[in-house]
Amino acid sequence: MMFGIGIVLFALAILVSVALHECGHMWVARATGMKVRRYFVGFGPTLWSTRRANRLGSTEYGIKAIPLGGFCDIAGMTSVDEIAPEDRPYAMYKQKVWKRVAVLFAGPAMNFVIGLVLIYGIAIVWGLPNLHQPTTAIVGETGCVAPQITLEEMGECTGPGPAALAGIQAGDEIVKVGDTEVKDFAGMAAAVRKLDGPTRIEFKRDGRVMDTVVDVTPTQRFTSADASAPSTVGAIGVSAVPVQPPAQYNPITAVPATFAFTGDLAVELGKSLAKIPTKIGALVEAIGGGERDKETPISVVGASIIGGETVDAGLWVAFWFFLAQLNFVLGAINLVPLLPFDGGHIAVATYEKIRNMIRSARGMVAAGPVNYLKLMPATYVVLAVVAGYMLLTVTADLVNPLSIFQ
């Protein structure tokens, strides 16, 4: 029940984010003297609309049947758009370049503002996590190897454990167990569990790669939460670096913390976005039944499923944090300098400005607006790529969705 409610809530949150994105365009367009003819949430047949007068004429507001986005129709966005004679003085393509760029940037800027507001709220209510938690197999502590009595209870042991006796210390990063290279603590533990007896282990200390022989000790462990009895597995007596709890803030200290955290988050999101083109093969493999790579991109469908999981688990902080990340990503993607994205229109306006500055320096008159009809073939290519990628991600999210618990 809560899972379904969570899906609906997150889908609505995405729709509100898109609607506010379009509001950003509309508000700045009006403020800079451009006429907004229509503002709609959704696509397809109109369910409801109303027209309201303003100082530049009137604007039609409405809701359409397919809640997968929205649009803000500004008169004369390009020189090839149809425009009524009375709207020509307010046409967007006739305005100064800085005004056009401001209108185009206002949409993505609204997404960034939404993300910042959400991060600020999270900082005050729940605190902000450390984005640089150790992800590799770094040793937090060494100790003796105790058997596991029950799922909640460990047995007793004394003295140093196998890892400590072999010279491994807290802070060392284990990179190889026997012939198995390990990337994280879970992978290291899984490799050790399969072993028994002296094993060569490589680790990094102060940037240097070292190795030692550790006598892997057999012990009793419950290997899964639903196991009825413990199994005999190998252990070396090391534990992971504990996860740092979220840092707490008040309404004042949360302001600089929000910007600092968002800067770190932007770097991590940028790394993820840069990997998108390399994940096509992983998406195809996931659709075919392979394991879904947790770094593969998701669609609105996948995002809503994850939103549903967070609500079902009562993880409201994860719900809002995921929505904040999504808004940052939406804003960044819309600034890609390719048509039909906002960034593509900004690139065209910037090109016109630079071109006319050069012409003016040469004593020539300013040239006319860029002919968007000549740019349509390239625009269609971008649309085809985006549509294909969306189809791929939606299919993967339906047949093999990502989960926050995997």
UniProtKB/Swiss-Prot annotation:
Question: What is the membrane topology here?
Answer: Multi-pass membrane protein
Domain of life, per lineage: Bacteria
Any one Pfam family here would be Peptidase_M50
- What cofactors are annotated for this protein? Zn(2+)
- What keywords would UniProt list here? Cell membrane, Hydrolase, Membrane, Metal-binding, Metalloprotease, Protease, Transmembrane, Transmembrane helix, Zinc
GO biological process, alphabetically ordered: proteolysis
**Could you list the residue ranges that cross the membrane?**
1-21, 108-128, 327-349, 375-395
Q: Which InterPro entries match?
A: PDZ_6 (IPR041489), PDZ_sf (IPR036034), Pept_M50_Zn (IPR004387), Peptidase_M50 (IPR008915)
Q: What protein name is recorded for this chain? A: Zinc metalloprotease Rip1
